[in-house]
């Protein structure tokens, strides 16, 4: 049976109000009383209900994180850094995996609002502006324009695409292509595409749906390699770049002599397990730090700029 606040009060020999004051650290209390209450809480295994505290107008110290795909290696690493940063500041994270599903994203948003979380960091993009503007909690967006009043933190996606294209050009590529997702031009992938096109205006861009299975994705990439015979490819994420290297090897296409490949994200996973891949690195740790910093300023009712853009870098491997 779950222990209640009144059970703690009875065991400690104090009033429920005193127990509440100990939990919330309010008013003067003797060390003896605090020790008695804490000992009773430990004996009974009592845990304060943060959501109930939020309903009383007190901070629940909870932050909602809404992401489209937490199994994606970039998002999983970013979420890990966000949780670490939030914990440093006394906040716990509620992780919501929207799976690019508008209904699921809306349900999560409503759940976080109902539980009066202190703030929300979101990278999902399925809902309309009205859905996010209705939320009273401070919101910070990662890489997405959620609403006019919501600050956006991102890395320089346009420059990342341009950097990749310039590197392929430097290494003599005559028939480069880009393989990307099906996002619009204002999305992170879309901005990388614009950066790539600023160097290779005539280069073909091939769009693969994020909903494709690995087998179907592999088939699509294989057809592209066989039909286009590119000498350089920029891919909008590292995992697709790694898959492309695998397919190229199966087709006996040597990397980097016949085909140069550049990925995007530069996670620690890729750096440690696929160091062969040359990729554009996003400053994931800095992104997490800035997202939390801006959110805490919004929670504290401070004015913040609308856009924050962090520089990207090059993680050199041997695929170029």
Curated annotation (Swiss-Prot):
Domain of life according to the entry: Bacteria
- GO MF annotations for this entry? DNA-binding transcription factor activity; transcription cis-regulatory region binding
Q: Where would I find the HTH lacI-type domain in this sequence?
A: 1-57
| Cited InterPro entries | HTH_LacI, LacI/GalR-like_sensor, Lambda_DNA-bd_dom_sf, Peripla_BP_I
* Keyword terms of this UniProt record: DNA-binding, Repressor, Transcription, Transcription regulation
Cysteines joined through disulfide linkages: none
Instruction: Quote the DNA-binding region ranges, renumbered to this chain.
Output: 5-24
Q: What is this protein's function? A: Negative regulator of scrB expression.
Q: Which PANTHER family does the record associate with it?
A: LACI-RELATED TRANSCRIPTIONAL REPRESSOR, RIBOSE OPERON REPRESSOR
Name this protein carries in UniProt:
Sucrose operon repressor
Q: Which organism is it from?
A: Streptococcus mutans serotype c (strain ATCC 700610 / UA159)
According to the entry, what is the taxonomic lineage of the organism? Bacteria, Bacillati, Bacillota, Bacilli, Lactobacillales
